């Protein structure tokens, strides 16, 4: 984790273009999502938007603690390759399945989702939300990153989630803002 934190810090200060940066969550958000994931009910764990795998490492720690596995989706080939290296180096490949491709190709009809962490291209959040929520188990948790710093782009999805009668939802001001939803 320390190496990815170092690279992320460097990329943010040296002007690396946004699409080439690792774009990972800060450590306190990693701890937060791992804590919530470990408390999720029985069912599948998924992550949408792997990047280099930093958030997945936090979730892998939770997987190990409670005997689960996670499937993570990354659409960009170079980031999927980097994530595979990250998982191998960290020794978590046994609890992480990386799928290179668009999560939206896999999510329709997906059932038994107990935990979902969403940190992908912001324009896709609404479609991902609509694909994930119907497949969530009661008590299932959906966390969407960047709910505060990308609020303008995410506002339609945020409004939908905060008013969705199937869920209890709120925005937690940690990191760049986390939308946390729990299925009723």
Annotate the PLM regions.
Residues 1-115, 122-143, 147-184:
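A short alpha-helical cap/connector motif
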